[in-house]
Structures are given as structure tokens and as C-alpha cells.
Amino acid sequence: MAPYHIRKYQDSDHRSVVDLFRRGMEEHIPATFRHMLLLPRTLLLLLGVPLTLFLASGSWLLVLLSILTLFLSLWFLAKYTWEKHVMNCLHTDMADITRTYLSSHSSCFWVAESRGQTVGMVAARPVKDPLLQKKQLQLLHLSVSLQHRREGLGKAMVRTVLQFAQMQGFSEVVLSTSMLQYAALALYQGMGFQKTGETFYTYLSRLRKSPMINLKYSLTSREGDL
């Protein structure tokens, strides 16, 4: 296991952070494709459309082309989902990471470095909701390089956020992650995060039945555990 060091983000990290974030999101395209492929409505289309075309035309070529078109459409939708998420982040909070996360003592952005390479990242900022009864910190953009998985780095990055939240006087750490991010969900729940609900942020996510899972870690009930 290669040694790593977790530190605050610097402007010189921007390109490597963006590359790491983009690669991490693109890893979920195959899982999203498989999830959509196994939906009942998709299976119905894969059976119904080719069968209808064959009965109407008797052409196996049309059948094969229709199946290929359906598969390509599903792959495009899966790819579009994650590419859109990346572009949205790069044009909002990650457009200027220093200004968004390092201009206030209550937010931060960390990178994990190993042998001069950026191999992990995570961010945190306060939840701005006047109706909240408790002070919440939102965990965002956790990503670990594929070559450094299963080394405890993901847990170390999350623990960094939890310790920061405790030091800044937050009561809870919250986050949202796609149900398709299986490894991330297992990591969070294994560290004590509790599911609080599900949210469909887009029509496409509702159509493919893949909600965002909302999770919460209560710091007030775990004092001394960190």
C-alpha cells in the first residue's frame, strides 16, 4: 500500500482534481447501463419492438438493427447522465474551488496525495437552510483513484470531513449519493451514516428508478468516536 497524505486543496491541483473527478464519475456508466437494461420496461421494449418488426417485415436485419439501436440509446443515456453531472459541477461549485470552499473557515476541500499524484478528493460546506434545527455540514465530491481503492483512503477522507465538522461545531454531516454508486453507499453506511430518504432530482432519474440516497451522520451522538 503506497503512503498518502491528505491536505488542503491548492490552485495547482485543479487539473488533477478535475481529471480524478471526471474519471470517477465515468466509472458509473456501465452500472447505470446495466441498471437500465434490466428495468421491466426496457426488457419489454427489447422483446416487443424486434418481435413487432419481424412480424411486420419478416426481416432479421431490421430486428438486429432495432436491438442495436436500443442498446446504443441506453448507453448514450447512461453516459449523458454522468457527463451532465460532471459539467454541472465544473460550472458551479468546482468552477472556482478556492473561492467556493477555502474562503470560509466553515468549508474546505481536501486532496489526498501519493508519490506526487492526486489520488483522492473530498469537499465539505455548510447547508444553508434557515429552517434547519441543527447545524449541518454537507459532504461532497468524494473520489478515490481506482489504483488506490481498498487501502482505507476513502474512509480516511470521510473521517477528515467528520473531524472537521466536529471541530467547527456542526451537529450533523449529510450527503446525497446515487443508488448506483454501490461502493460509496457501502462505505458511508459502514462508517455509521444513516439513510434519511430518497430524492429524484430529474425526470430521467425517476424514469430509470435510480434515486439519490440521502444520508446523515449525527456527531452529537458519537462524540469521542472520531
Curated annotation (Swiss-Prot):
TM regions (residue ranges): 36-56, 58-78
EC numbers: 2.3.1.48
Pfam families, per the entry: Acetyltransf_1 (PF00583)
Top enzyme class of this protein? transferase
Source species, domain of life: Eukaryota
Native species of this protein? Mus musculus (Mouse)
Segments forming domain N-acetyltransferase: 61-220
Q: Could you give a single Gene Ontology term from the biological process aspect? A: axis elongation
Per the record, the similarity remark reads: Belongs to the camello family.
Q: Which GO terms describe its molecular function?
A: histone H4 acetyltransferase activity; N-acetyltransferase activity
What name is this protein filed under? N-acetyltransferase family 8 member 3
> What SUPFAM superfamilies would the database entry show?
Acyl-CoA N-acyltransferases (Nat) (SSF55729)
Q: Which reaction does it catalyse?
A: L-lysyl-[protein] + acetyl-CoA = N(6)-acetyl-L-lysyl-[protein] + CoA + H(+)
Q: What does this protein do?
A: Has histone acetyltransferase activity in vitro, with specificity for histone H4.
Q: How does it sit in the membrane?
A: Multi-pass membrane protein
The cross-references to PANTHER family, in alphabetical order and at most eight, read: GNAT FAMILY N-ACETYLTRANSFERASE, N-ACETYLTRANSFERASE FAMILY 8 MEMBER 3-RELATED
| UniProt keyword Thylakoid, yes or no | no
Which locations, inside or outside the cell, does it occupy? Nucleus membrane; Cytoplasm, Perinuclear region; Cytoplasm
The protein's UniProt keywords, in alphabetical order, are: Acyltransferase, Cytoplasm, Membrane, Nucleus, Transferase, Transmembrane, Transmembrane helix
- Please name the taxonomic classification of the source: Eukaryota, Metazoa, Chordata, Craniata, Vertebrata
Show the PROSITE patterns listed in the entry. GNAT (PS51186)
An example GO CC term for this entry is:
nucleus
